[in-house]
């Protein structure tokens, strides 16, 4: 949109207008994104997260939706992590085995492992058993945390109501 200097675009599905998306709809949402649950509120597909983070889905269903929980960065030791990770959270973390294990044991719905760090077979098996999606990204934790909200579907931003339309004769 920026490159073409377009400020409004129609959102269509099968040649039918679904809504309208403006640059300000997107920027307002990102600038006011103090809500750590916005990714789940938007019902974001895991495949969108994988694409946005230029990552790989290691465990889980890419067509599934992230629908409950907050997004957080695990930047503490596991003892402290236990106090702030809740069931269904999406946890962005690094290569520390203990942090990955803690997030899964605290019933996170998804862990995003940064810097392309390897994920051990034990962590993969436990994640599979517990239904925890595992995504690997080459990005560092700061970049992953910055970009992850860009994976939200446009349907979350677009305006659907009170659209004035017309047809050509």
Regions found by a protein language model. Name each.
Residues 73-158:
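Feature captures the catalytic cores and cofactor-binding loops of soluble hydro-lyases/lyases
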Residues 6, 10, 16-33, 139:
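Short beta->alpha transition motifs characteristic of CBS
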Residues 1-5, 11-12, 164-169:
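The conserved cystathionine-beta-synthase
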Residues 14, 23-24, 52, 60-61, ...:
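Fold-independent oxyanion-binding glycine-rich loops
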Residues 43-47, 159-164:
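Internal, active-site/partner-interface "lid" segment
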Residues 36-96:
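Protease-associated
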């Amino acid at each position: 949109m920026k490159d073409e200097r377009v400020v409004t675009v129609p959102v269509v599905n099968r040649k039918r207008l679904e809504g309208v998306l403006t640059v300000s709809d997107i920027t307002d949402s990102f600038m006011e994104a103090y809500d750590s649950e916005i990714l789940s509120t938007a019902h974001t597909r895991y495949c969108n997260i994988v694409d946005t983070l230029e990552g790989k889905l290691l465990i889980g269903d890419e067509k599934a939706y992230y629908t409950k929980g907050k997004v957080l960065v695990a930047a503490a030791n596991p003892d402290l992590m236990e106090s702030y990770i809740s069931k269904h959270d999406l946890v962005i973390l690094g290569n520390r085995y203990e942090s990955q294990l803690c997030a899964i044991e605290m019933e996170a719905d998804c862990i995003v492992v940064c810097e392309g760090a390897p994920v051990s077979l034990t962590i993969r098996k436990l994640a599979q058993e517990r239904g925890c999606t595992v995504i690997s990204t080459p990005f560092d934790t700061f970049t992953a945390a910055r970009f992850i909200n860009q994976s939200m579907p446009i349907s979350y931003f677009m305006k659907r109501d009170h659209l004035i339309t017309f047809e050509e004769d």
